């Protein structure tokens, strides 16, 4: 299915970008892309966003495996007839696997996208995180649109 190709594409872009950061930037260094808005910053994370559950790798391993099995099952069952759901789940699967690969092989996640939103210093993130968030937002939008159609 094309949705697995989307997941593989996310994994590839995520892992290549992280490899480039690890090979070419010292930990903690930043490259400004748009001053006061967007930076490429070499950062490592041993937990989730905002340092939640730091150094609890076993927890992330278990949760990710269960989550990936659920996503694959859900894709097989429901994505055949629903393109947007399939695309969303492909993005989520790719994002989950991208960070899982880091946790297994590096015991930490490589983050590098650093943004300031209205002067708020948002936690540094990566391509996998972005794919996960975009996938979730697409599912929320789809759910809201379907709810609106059902009311009409």
From Swiss-Prot:
Gene Ontology cellular-component terms listed: plasma membrane
Superkingdom of source: Bacteria
EC number(s) reported in the record: 3.4.23.36
Organism listed in the record: Bacillus cereus (strain B4264)
Coiled coil location: none
Main location class: membrane
Identification of the protein by name: Lipoprotein signal peptidase
Family membership: Belongs to the peptidase A8 family.
């Amino acid at each position: 299915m094309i949705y697995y190709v989307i997941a593989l594409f996310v994994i590839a872009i995520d892992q290549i970008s992280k490899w480039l950061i690890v090979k070419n930037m010292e930990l903690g260094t930043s490259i400004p892309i748009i001053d006061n808005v967007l930076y490429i910053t070499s950062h490592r994370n041993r937990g989730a966003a905002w340092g939640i559950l730091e150094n609890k790798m076993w927890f992330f391993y278990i949760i990710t495996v269960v989550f990936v099995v659920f996503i694959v099952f859900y894709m097989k069952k429901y994505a055949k007839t629903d393109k947007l759901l399939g695309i969303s789940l492909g993005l989520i699967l790719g994002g989950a696997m991208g960070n899982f690969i880091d946790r297994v092989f590096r015991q930490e996640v490589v983050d590098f996208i650093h943004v300031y939103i209205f002067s708020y210093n948002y936690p540094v993130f990566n391509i996998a995180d972005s794919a996960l968030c975009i996938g979730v937002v697409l599912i929320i939008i789809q759910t809201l649109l379907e709810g609106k159609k059902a009311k009409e």
